[in-house]
Amino acid sequence: MKLITAIIKPFKLEEVRASLDMLGITGMTITEVKGFGRQKGHTELYRGAEYVIDFLPKIKVEIAVSVDQVNDAIDAIIKSANTGKIGDGKIFVSSLDKVLRIRTGETDQDAI
């Protein structure tokens, strides 16, 4: 089992959710986060004053999938989150040692 963590632009969340849903991946955790990568933030004008915005709003999507779903899930996220502009995000894939559904006690693949 793998944990896929994707950091995406907030307005792309619904597209990402819909493309994962088409693969049968319906469970996910969404977190509002702030951060920056190569774009290093930006400046904005507010009431005539210039402000530096160091951290940009992003969405963190976390999904647990079986090993055979990893590549399809990554492809779906890339296709739906891509704008072709800087700041589109990142995808991280890590191993899951154990998954447990609290309500039923199911474990691993059955718990996903």
Briefly describe each language-model feature range.
Residues 1-112:
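Positively charged, small/polar-rich N-terminal and surface patches that mediate targeting and assembly
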